[in-house]
């Protein structure tokens, strides 16, 4: 039909269309009920009429117009659900042409039918919109498209040729409709092809009113056979259809899985991301066997089949072992994808097998085996298998956490990946209200916090998230989480944990939760009161990583979003071999090059035998060079270069941890380790003062590689022998350096066996070294802990040189040395041993040597005292001669001159007898007193007495005191008149005392000898009586009222000869040592005799004067105050006289602190908490 005819018929059709549209609008507006009823009654008629019209249009269609329409552009026309579609221009032309032809034949029928179609469509739309919700529009649209597809397929069974061409076309249209939902072209782009003329608008209206008929007309074409299309065009169309089908399936999947669970969504995302890689490998399209050099190489069909068998779920388990080996032997190229996929499957099996074998005892061994395999490549599989194993067996969570802690210390990225996946798993389970997954994941996170893999902030965030919305499940999860990591959190941040417990208390008081959960909260508070003793943070057997070596990850709940599930799947590696070699070198550094599988320690290094063999190999190489005649450079350039690099790294690093990592990357040989340790020590010694940087650095290095411990031990032993070669500054720095190593247990304490502290081997440089060494240790540890460490049984044999017990001379030297440097508290055992040593049987060598040393100086003292007495006698005689007349002086000189030799012999014999008796008595007394307690006086006398004096000194001192008193009396007799003789006689008779030598002015030689013999006999028989006399004299001296007399007596004793002055000083020392015990005994005797109530008569004797007292509280109080005052006065007076040297004062203060006696001096030790008298 011509175009002119069509144009001439356009205005004729206009009123009909307008009328139809107006009629339809009026009908719909006036009454919708009538249209609905009309549609129900005439539904079958409308459908039959539409079919007839479409069949007539298709029959009249010519082949030429179809051919032209296929080549033209697409034209846009509206769809019945409102959205626009893109169809070929062929259909639009055909529809217009049919419309013009039909208008000639049946114009009225067409208008009525279009009106009916419009009404039916509107009613359908309104009912459809009311019935469906917004969420289900997509599914309704799909069901509609399926129904139309089925209705269309029923009309295509007439002609085969038309059916093929139109079915393809129909499928493309339907796919375009699907893609237009979320992926089609924008409306703004499609509007460009629409003409803005009135004719086009009119045509668009008519087309929209008859869209239903037009869609049916596509499928009912004439039965004439169309010519077949070219095969090239058909192939391109098929490819286009496949592409559209894949795209539509993807978008349908995305739309459908919005309501599906999270796991399936993750799998879909992963499939989309890795579709190309996995699809190419499975189909064999990709370059599976390709390397970097040969990209076009391909796997053979046989290799692909074997690869499918090996990478299947069974993993080749259905095959026999021989066949499996044959298949694996065929694939040998490591750079091929087939080999890499097989290796990955084997790695996955190893990882699963090792993780299933983990327990408390085998954690270290299994982690060591895991580190041998490339867990960096299989980190995704490792994390997945650990999480899966922990979920199936939560009782072993602490074991898995310990294994993760070891791996995290070596590879922190693996620990971070596992922690991220756990956090994401917890967040998803918390959002889905999955209680079991929340419990398992939170349990694992708690143990990772205990192992210092995760930071405590993550634990606090989880607790706050659970307690903010307090339901039964949330509170139960929070309680289990707090039980596991509560001890660690209280150590780190006790305030925040206290706030969480306060929130739990408020929740408990509200009473909204279940009774079971309330009981769980009460149990948690009881566990907190007990200090989490049943829920320890880390078991001792699982504390395998030290705090300094652990890497803690600070992750927040909001930051963690991506779990990196791609790492679970296979990925082709172009540089497979180089990466594997790198990991092997890394594992050797971690595990040691010659480490055995049974070893449980990490970074232990090579064995000593291998080190020796390496050194021997180096020596043999050097000898071979000498024999071969090569030139060898003895300047050692390699050693100089090593020193330079170490020195530069030490000075360039800011922190000791950074420096340790750099130094360990140098990969030193075993022969270079001694030089390395020596360089570190030299750098430390050259500093002006000691720097802790070097101590911390060596401690870190020794913990990272234990092969450095032995070189440091050898260096310490060498320095102890060569201290005389170093100056004081270097000695102090080195001593503090090794003190830090011993305190941190970087090297063992067995090194101290090389130190020997004796008088023969004592050198000033060695003493300085030991002094600074021990003082630094006491500063680090404290005196109490240091003393406790030295008393352990392990160090008993190593400290024999520092604290000798074989010889009393060495014992005294060690005691004096440590007391002089302010560490006298260490020598308590030696002091006790020195006191108890004489008790041992004479058969033992040590007791014999000790007793001989103690007895030898007693003879010397006795001889020296006898000589002193002779001198005193000579002086006394001179004093008496002054008072006598000149005649008697000559007579006495003659008598003394004749009998001088005889008198000397007698006195020597008596003195020796007396010394023997007194020494025996003292020995028996010491045995009786030592069974009860160690007395302070004997201990102090033995320690402070020099080696030339003995315990018999006390008896000699008592005699010398009496002599000094006799001298003082002679000095006073010069002033007194002759009538005082009678008074002295009366006093002697009343007091019943022994007769003095100097009572008479004129004494013959016989009287002097008789008085001396009587005194010596009485003293030898009754040694106890002499001690009582001494105590009575001291009491009288303290309790006497007149202090002036005592001062005069003391001054008179001072201007005696130098020999007498030495004896006086010795007496003062003895008195000072005995003072605490003497004062106690004196006060007890003073109170027994009546105390302040005791009065004296005219002759100076005490009398008990009883006073009638009232038993009132105030009288008692006054009496007690009086006693205190009296006691304080006596102590203050006596203590002010005593004067001691610095060493003796320090020791006396120490003994006072030990035995709880008050002293007048300010105490220097910081451990003393007693009050002292000033």
UniProtKB/Swiss-Prot annotation:
Gene3D superfamilies: 1.25.40.180
Keyword flag Nucleus: yes
Basic and acidic residues: bias regions: 1-15, 79-92, 183-200, 235-259, 910-924, 1089-1118
Chief place of localization: nucleus
Keyword Nucleus carried by entry: yes
GO molecular function terms noted in the UniProt entry: RNA binding
Location relative to the cell: Nucleus speckle
Keyword set, alphabetical order: Differentiation, mRNA processing, mRNA splicing, Nucleus, Sexual differentiation
GO cellular component terms listed in the entry, alphabetical order: catalytic step 2 spliceosome; nuclear speck
Protein family (similarity comment): Belongs to the CWC22 family.
Subunit structure and binding partners: Component of the spliceosome C complex.
UniProt function note: Male determiner protein (M-factor) that controls male somatic sexual differentiation. Acts as a dominant factor that regulates the mRNA splicing of transformer (tra) and doublesex (dsx) transcripts and promotes expression of male splice forms of tra and dsx. Probably acts as a component of the spliceosome C complex required for mRNA splicing factor and exon-junction complex (EJC) assembly. Hinders eIF4AIII from non-specifically binding RNA and escorts it to the splicing machinery to promote EJC assembly on mature mRNAs.
Name of the protein in its database record: Male determiner protein Mdmd(Y)
């Amino acid at each position: 039909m011509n175009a002119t005819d069509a144009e001439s018929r356009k205005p004729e059709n206009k009123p009909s269309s307008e009328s139809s549209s107006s009629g339809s609008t009026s009908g719909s507006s006036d009454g919708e009920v009538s249209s609905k009823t009309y549609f129900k009654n005439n539904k079958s008629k409308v459908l039959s009429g539409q079919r007839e019209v479409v069949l007539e249009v298709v029959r009249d269609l010519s082949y030429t117009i179809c051919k032209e329409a296929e080549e033209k552009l697409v034209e846009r026309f509206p769809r019945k659900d409102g959205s626009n579609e893109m169809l070929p221009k062929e259909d639009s032309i055909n529809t217009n042409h049919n419309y013009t032809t039909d208008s000639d034949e049946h114009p009225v029928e067409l208008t009525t039918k279009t009106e009916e179609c419009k009404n039916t469509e509107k009613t359908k739309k309104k009912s459809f919109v009311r019935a469906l919700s917004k969420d289900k529009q997509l599914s309704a649209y799909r069901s509609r498209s399926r129904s139309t597809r089925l209705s269309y397929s029923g009309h295509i069974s007439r002609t085969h040729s038309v059916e093929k061409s139109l079915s393809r076309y129909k499928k493309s249209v339907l796919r375009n409709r699907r893609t237009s939902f979320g992926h089609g072209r924008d409306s703004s782009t499609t509007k460009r092809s629409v003409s803005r003329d009135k004719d086009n608008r009119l045509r668009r209206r008519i087309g929209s009113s008859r869209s239903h008929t037009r869609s049916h007309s596509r499928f009912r074409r004439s039965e004439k056979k169309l010519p077949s299309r070219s095969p090239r065009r058909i192939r391109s169309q098929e490819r286009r259809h496949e592409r559209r089908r894949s795209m539509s399936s993807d978008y349908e999947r995305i739309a459908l899985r919005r309501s599906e669970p999270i796991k399936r969504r993750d799998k879909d995302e992963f499939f989309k991301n890795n579709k190309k890689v996995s699809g190419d490998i499975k189909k064999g399209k990709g370059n599976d066997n390709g390397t970097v050099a040969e990209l076009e190489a391909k796997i053979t069909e046989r290799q692909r089949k074997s690869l499918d068998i090996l990478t299947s779920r069974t993993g080749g388990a259905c095959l026999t072992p021989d066949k499996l080996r044959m298949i694996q032997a065929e694939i040998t190229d490591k750079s091929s994808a087939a080999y890499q996929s097989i290796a990955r499957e084997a790695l996955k099996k190893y990882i699963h097998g090792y993780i299933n074998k983990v327990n408390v005892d085998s954690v270290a061994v299994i982690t060591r085996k895991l580190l041998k395999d490339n867990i960096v490549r299989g980190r995704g599989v490792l994390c997945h298998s650990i999480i899966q194993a922990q979920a199936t067996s939560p009782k072993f969570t602490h074991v898995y956490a310990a294994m993760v802690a070891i791996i995290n210390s070596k590879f922190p990225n693996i620990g971070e990946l596992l922690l991220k996946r756990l956090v994401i798993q917890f967040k998803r389970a918390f959002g889905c209200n999955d209680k079991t997954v929340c419990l398992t994941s939170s349990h694992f996170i708690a143990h990772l916090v205990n192992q210092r893999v995760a930071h405590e902030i993550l634990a606090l965030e989880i607790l706050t998230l659970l307690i903010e919305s307090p339901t039964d499940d949330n509170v139960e999860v929070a309680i289990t989480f707090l039980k596991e990591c509560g001890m660690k959190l209280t150590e780190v941040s006790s305030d925040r944990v206290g706030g969480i417990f306060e929130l739990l208390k408020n929740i408990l008081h509200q009473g909204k939760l279940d009774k079971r959960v309330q009981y769980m909260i009460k149990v948690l508070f009881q566990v907190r009161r007990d200090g989490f003793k049943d829920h320890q943070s880390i078991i001792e057997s699982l504390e395998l990583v030290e705090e300094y070596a652990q890497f803690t990850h600070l992750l927040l709940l909001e930051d963690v979003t991506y779990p990196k599930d791609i790492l679970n799947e296979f990925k082709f590696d172009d540089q497979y071999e180089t990466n594997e070699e790198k990991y092997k070198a890394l594992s050797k550094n971690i595990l040691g090059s010659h480490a055995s599988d049974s070893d449980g320690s990490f970074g232990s290094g090579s064995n000593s035998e291998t080190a020796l063999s390496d050194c021997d190999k180096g020596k043999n190489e050097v000898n071979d060079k000498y024999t071969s005649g090569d030139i060898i450079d003895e300047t050692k350039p390699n050693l100089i270069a090593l020193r330079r690099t170490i020195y530069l790294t030490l000075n360039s690093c800011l922190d000791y941890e950074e420096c340790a990592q750099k130094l360990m990357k140098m990969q030193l040989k075993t022969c270079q380790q001694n030089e390395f340790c020596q360089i570190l020590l030299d750098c430390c010694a050259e500093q002006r003062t000691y720097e802790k940087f070097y101590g911390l650095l060596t401690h870190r290095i020794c913990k990272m590689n234990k092969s450095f411990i032995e070189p440091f031990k050898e260096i310490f032993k060498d320095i102890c022998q060569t201290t005389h070669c170093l100056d004081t500054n270097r000695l102090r720095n080195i001593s503090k350096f090794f003190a830090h190593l011993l305190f941190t247990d970087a090297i063992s304490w067995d090194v101290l066996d090389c130190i020997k502290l004796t008088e023969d081997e004592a050198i000033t440089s060695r003493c300085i070294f030991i002094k600074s060494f021990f003082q630094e240790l006491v500063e680090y540890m404290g005196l109490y802990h240091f003393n406790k460490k030295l008393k352990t049984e392990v160090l008993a044999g190593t400290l024999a040189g520092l604290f000798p017990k074989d010889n009393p001379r060495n014992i005294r030297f060690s005691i004096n040395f440590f007391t002089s440097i302010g560490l006298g508290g260490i020598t308590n055992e030696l002091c006790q041993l020195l006191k108890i040593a004489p008790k041992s049987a004479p058969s033992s060598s040590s007791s014999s040597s000790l007793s001989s040393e103690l007895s030898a100086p007693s003879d010397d003292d006795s001889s020296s005292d006898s000589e002193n007495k002779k001198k005193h006698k000579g002086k006394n005689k001179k004093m008496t001669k002054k008072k006598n007349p000149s005649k008697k002086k000559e007579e006495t000189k003659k008598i003394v001159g004749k009998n001088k030799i005889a008198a000397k012999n007698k006195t020597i014999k008596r003195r020796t007898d007396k010394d023997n008796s007194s020494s025996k008595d003292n020995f028996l007394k010491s045995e009786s007193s030592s069974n009860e307690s160690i007395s302070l006086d004997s201990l102090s006398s033995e320690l402070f007495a020099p080696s030339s004096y003995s315990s018999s000194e006390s008896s000699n001192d008592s005699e010398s005191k009496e002599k000094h008193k006799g001298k003082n009396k002679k000095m006073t007799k010069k002033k007194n008149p002759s009538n005082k003789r009678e008074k002295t006689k009366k006093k002697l008779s009343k007091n019943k005392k022994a007769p003095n030598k100097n009572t008479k002015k004129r004494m013959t030689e016989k009287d002097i000898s008789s008085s001396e013999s009587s005194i010596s006999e009485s003293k030898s028989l009754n040694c106890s009586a002499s001690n009582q006399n001494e105590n009575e004299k001291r009491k009288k001296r303290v309790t006497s009222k007149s202090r002036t007399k005592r001062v005069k007596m003391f001054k008179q004793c001072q201007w005696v000869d130098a020999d007498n002055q030495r004896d006086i000083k010795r007496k003062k020392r003895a008195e000072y040592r005995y003072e605490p015990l003497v004062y106690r005994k004196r006060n007890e005797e003073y109170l027994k005799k009546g105390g302040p109530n005791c009065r004296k008569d005219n002759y100076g004797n005490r009398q008990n004067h009883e006073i009638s007292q009232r038993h009132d509280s105030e009288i008692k109080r006054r009496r007690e105050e009086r006693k205190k005052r009296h006691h304080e006065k006596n102590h203050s007076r006596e203590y002010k006289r005593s004067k001691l040297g610095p060493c003796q004062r320090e020791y006396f203060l120490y003994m006072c602190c030990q035995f709880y006696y008050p002293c007048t001096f300010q105490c220097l030790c910081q451990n003393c908490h007693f009050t002292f008298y000033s």
